[in-house]
Design a protein with these regions (language model features):
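FMN-binding flavodoxin-like domain, especially the glycine-rich phosphate-binding loop
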Residues: 2-4, 14-17, 21-44, 48-145
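Short polar catalytic/cofactor-binding loops
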Residues: 9-13
Length: 145
C-alpha cells in the first residue's frame, strides 16, 4: 500500500492542527500516513514513503530549525533515491509566509515533484483553513494513486 510522510514542526499547535488535517485528507483516499514531528522523523521514514508533506511555522521568513535539521540529516543519504516523488507543503505564519521559499528550495534539492501551490495560513487555523489542508492532503494522495 502507498504511504505518505507528513513531517512538521509546531510550537503553538497551529502547524500541528494543519498537519492533522492534511493527514485526514490523505487517509480519506486510502493511503497510509506517517505523521511525525521533524525532530522525530528519520531517513527510513523518508525512504519508505511514496510522497511527502512538509509543514512549518514561519520563523523570520525561514522554516523551523527542526525541519531544516531533518533535511540536513536526510539529504545526502537519500540522494538519488527519492527523485520525482510528489510533495506538498504548508506554512503557518503571523503575517509573513515567506518560509515557503526555503521549503521549496529544499524540495528542489531533493529533486521532488511539486504537486500544487503551498498552503499559507495566517494565525490560528480556521475551519476553512483546515478544509484547505484536507484538500491539500487529497491532492497529494491523488498524485500517488
Amino acid at each position: 500500500m502507498a504511504k505518505v510522510l507528513v513531517v512538521y514542526h509546531t510550537q503553538t499547535g497551529n502547524t500541528e492542527k494543519l498537519a492533522l488535517a492534511v493527514k485526514e485528507g490523505i487517509g480519506s483516499c486510502g493511503i497510509d500516513v506517517i505523521l511525525k514531528k521533524a525532530s522525530e522523523a528519520n531517513l527510513e521514514d523518508l525512504l519508505s514513503s511514496d510522497g511527502y508533506c512538509f509543514g512549518t511555522p514561519d520563523y523570520f521568513s525561514y522554516m523551523a530549525g527542526s525541519l531544516k535539521d531533518f533535511f540536513d540529516r536526510t539529504c545526502y543519504p537519500s540522494e538519488g533515491k527519492i527523485t520525482n516523488r510528489p510533495y506538498v507543503c504548508f506554512v503557518s505564519h503571523g503575517g509573513g509566509g515567506k518560509a515557503v521559499g526555503s521549503l521549496e528550495t529544499m524540495a528542489e534539492r531533493f529533486k521532488l515533484k511539486k504537486i500544487t501551490e503551498p498552503l499559507l495560513v495566517e494565525g490560528k487555523p480556521k475551519k476553512e483553513d483546515l478544509q484547505k489542508a484536507r484538500e491539500l492532503g487529497k491532492k497529494l494522495a491523488k498524485a500517488i494513486i
